[in-house]
Amino acid sequence: MSRTESRRVTQRQIAQLAGVSQATVSLVLNNRTGGDIRIPDETRERVLRVIEETKYVADPSARRLAGVDNRILGVFTYEPAFPTRSLDFYTPLLNGIEAGAEELGSDLLLFTSTPVVDGRRRLFHERNRLRLADGVLLLGVEMDPNELARLVIEGFRVVAVGRRDTPAIPYVGIDYTAATAQVVGRALALGHRRVLYLRLDSDGESVRDRYQGVLNATSATDVVLADRLSDGSDLEADWREITTFAPTLVIAESPEVAQSLHDRAVHEGYDVPRDLSIIALGSSPRVSPDDVSFTRLNPPRTELGQRAVHLLARLLSDDDYPSADELRTLLPCPIIDGATLSAPTQEARP
């Protein structure tokens, strides 16, 4: 057998490759020491070396049958969780995950040693430590569909935080499509017909779901819709698009972009929302009394993290395993009325 095959490697095969008994492999995997257990260091190192070479990861269900329940939940983020630009996305999620783990009496293990390839962390690598956790929560705007498919094929207990297209991967997500269509529909009912959508440059499901919501609301109408990729790094180009296209409504996927454009519009003498309405398809958890009250989506990310933990706990349970419908669920996304949307006072400001 090749030591680099991608299918699941069994403990029996590990034992054959290392020239030891299957019981020895089990003892090494579970770090059993003390008492009458005596495994020479050379033997232990040989078993660990084969484990690394074959990319072996223990089946969590087998670990539970063997009485190994660490009460540890792993957390893997495809993007760094703590840089300032990521805080608004990850902080409420991690708060919810922490609260859920506390309710269950479990500890959290954040996987940080994974390699970065093409700007993205890789879940599978030669020093994979997934076996240290009973189950794993996956976080990220974009996830590798090949890795998700492999997790499913190899029977890992995982839950993705956010909707995923990959078949059979359990997830708890937010229904961005319905909420986006609803809030944009409100704007159209007020009379907006020239709409500019500033969207993120990402193929993540949540990004595509918001875009689909915009399309659902504006299709089969007389709305003139323009869209532009924007992460807020080129405010001048964003503003130039506004002055050229002359929309009465700007939809900004990023709350930071919405804030920057609001400030620029006010500086240029625009009355928001009379001259220019702005909708944000997200919310910042860092709110102060002086902040603009945007008409916006308010994703329940703390609840999302907590619900994902609960689903993972049920996947690990022998008594409360979720039904097929419960394995992939979407939470409704609240809409904040705010103060940046009103009927246009004219077709468009030149």
Describe these PLM feature segments.
Residues 1-6, 68, 72-185, 189, ...:
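Alpha-helical recognition/docking segments in bacterial nutrient-uptake
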Residues 1-68:
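N-terminal helix-turn-helix DNA-binding module of bacterial transcription factors
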Residues 80-92, 110-120, 172-182, 198-238, ...:
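Hinge/beta->alpha junction and helix N-cap segments in small-molecule ligand-binding domains
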Residues 137, 159, 172, 196, ...:
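Hydrophobic/aromatic beta-strand patches that form the interior of the parallel beta-sheet core
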Residues 237-350:
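Flexible loop/turn connectors
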